[in-house]
UniProtKB/Swiss-Prot annotation:
Pfam families linked: M20_dimer, Peptidase_M20
Region of interest called Disordered, as start-end residue ranges on this chain: 44-65
Manganese in keyword set: no
This protein's name: Carboxypeptidase S
Post-translational modification: Glycosylated.
Cytoplasmic side: 1-19
Amino acid sequence: MIALPVEKAPRKSLWQRHRAFISGIVALIIIGTFFLTSGLHPAPPHEAKRPHHGKGPMHSPKCEKIEPLSPSFKHSVDTILHDPAFRNSSIEKLSNAVRIPTVVQDKNPNPADDPDFYKHFYELHDYFEKTFPNIHKHLKLEKVNELGLLYTWEGSDPDLKPLLLMAHQDVVPVNNETLSSWKFPPFSGHYDPETDFVWGRGSNDCKNLLIAEFEAIEQLLIDGFKPNRTIVMSLGFDEEASGTLGAASLASFLHERYGDDGIYSIIDEGEGIMEVDKDVFVATPINAEKGYVDFEVSILGHGGHSSVPPDHTTIGIASELITEFEANPFDYEFEFDNPIYGLLTCAAEHSKSLSKDVKKTILGAPFCPRRKDKLVEYISNQSHLRSLIRTTQAVDIINGGVKANALPETTRFLINHRINLHSSVAEVFERNIEYAKKIAEKYGYGLSKNGDDYIIPETELGHIDITLLRELEPAPLSPSSGPVWDILAGTIQDVFENGVLQNNEEFYVTTGLFSGNTDTKYYWNLSKNIYRFVGSIIDIDLLKTLHSVNEHVDVPGHLSAIAFVYEYIVNVNEYA
């Protein structure tokens, strides 16, 4: 999720990008077509091109029912979900946190250099200390890069790898031009009993998860729980600006302490539970993220008076290269270890709305190339879904020329890619060079990469350069089977089947995929088991407000998120 400058048009957040396919999922099921956003099982060995952590089921796709995993220490789960006094107290805690405007921009100073810029973060820290006294009495608090909060609840067995919970303290700005459109002031934290919503910026991204983790641990302390496994909370402060000051520093600090694969599992913000058909629910903790890369493409030519122009200015060359890129999108590459396949499987096996033909195509795809091709065709025809099975490209910025009668010496544009699971930064770079070479040869330009590595020598007209600006490989796939997954999935199953939904057995757990990136991108070397999940039932209309006007969160969803964190901590200690 990327921060937005105040007064500028809102930029689509990671959650906003996902609200589209979540909305589309429900509609697509109703009309009997295809839907996806998340998935389950890895591919058969002969089809998997990329290793994943752990061994997943490699046979017939099945959206099997997970056995609920209920701990013996379950003192307050029912209280969290159903007690009016706890509910009212929780509403107040979340509302008060939303009232503190911990806003970040795209670019932010180092906290030590400009503490006044972060004054509201210090206010939030004081609020935590006053609101959660047991945590601040019994847990060790360390501050990393001034504002990163690291809470450690020491377990009795130092040989056990710690459990790590993540969230971020920061929120995106509010566009001042939208203030009149807000139902309640954006930092009011207003609770509306008619809708059962808490309103305000950050209420659903992600002060809900932040406060849920605090509340769960505070309640465990009140209940007298004593962990044998250490519990760590790592709370960044600039996730909306890519986490370069917060999560990056925290991850480095934790790596020095615990080393490679030193953490049992990591839970951060992510997707939740969706009702994919009437009374059929699927939980989708995210176990993978696409990669990311930005390239700056420069057409470096010569200036002069516009009255004696060449056949093609640098702007013209840039335009044709952009056209070449956009006329040649990346191929669709779908394998069955793509997490989106699991939700398709759940729909095929449990939805009453999908046609038999659709179900046969989904379930038969691993065994029949023709059906796999048909499945890919269906996915690729859904505009909100196709980005999950290919590398995307978007030309987002372009600059060239300064005056009507002066030829532009240089034209530059930026192209952003979200990299498919089985691709890489190098593969994307090579492909971009291929098309740039075609244009360079066509118009007699040289070609270089990263400024000084010439593929074609510079000519009298100039040269084209492609420079890599920022890169992130696709995230490793975390397990969708095995002991760590079983405890996570079993906890989700128990909290929702037996608690939130009151014995509704049409509840399934699978995994999911993000096309954007969370703070977990800095934590890959700390654990093979990274899951992005908030224990709440997804409301489509609610998701439309993320990073936008009238952001809000439903109270029942917030309470279930607390219950999940509470029970997951206990289950990890009892069963891992």
